[in-house]
Amino acid sequence: MDIYKIAIDTFLAETSECKASGCAVFFGADIAFQDIQLHTHRNKSELHFMAGHTMLSIPLASILSIEKLVLRDIQTTEYEIITKESGTITLDVV
């Protein structure tokens, strides 16, 4: 397993349109989706995730880090986004 910290633009280039499963856990709320087409993009102030009929927007200023874990044995890449509000978004991309 290889772990890397990556920039937002690298994350967007790798996940702009992909098949993914994921979950987002924030204080008082959570969402999850499985094996669905994911679209990611950003504007000047927010990072947007669209999975099916679900959209999640995160202020860019609240993102502390994005980690990329390459799981070679199961041919999956996992991305973990950690926010200032102690929120975590985990995406598994095949």
For each predicted feature, which ranges?
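Amphipathic/hydrophobic helical signal segments and adjacent flexible N-terminal regions
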Residues: 1-8
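Short, solvent-exposed coil/turn segments at beta-strand boundaries
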Residues: 14-15, 41-44, 74
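A short, Trp-centered hydrophobic/proline-enriched beta-strand micro-motif
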Residues: 13-25
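Short beta-strand-centered aromatic/proline hotspots
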Residues: 31-39
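Glycine-centered tight beta-turn/hairpin loop motif at sheet-sheet or coil-to-beta transitions
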Residues: 26-28, 51-55, 84-88
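Short aromatic-glycine-enriched beta-strand elements
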Residues: 43-48, 77-79
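Short, compact, well-ordered microdomains
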Residues: 64-94
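Structured surface patches comprising rigid loops and adjacent beta-strands/short helices at the edges
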Residues: 36-37, 55-72
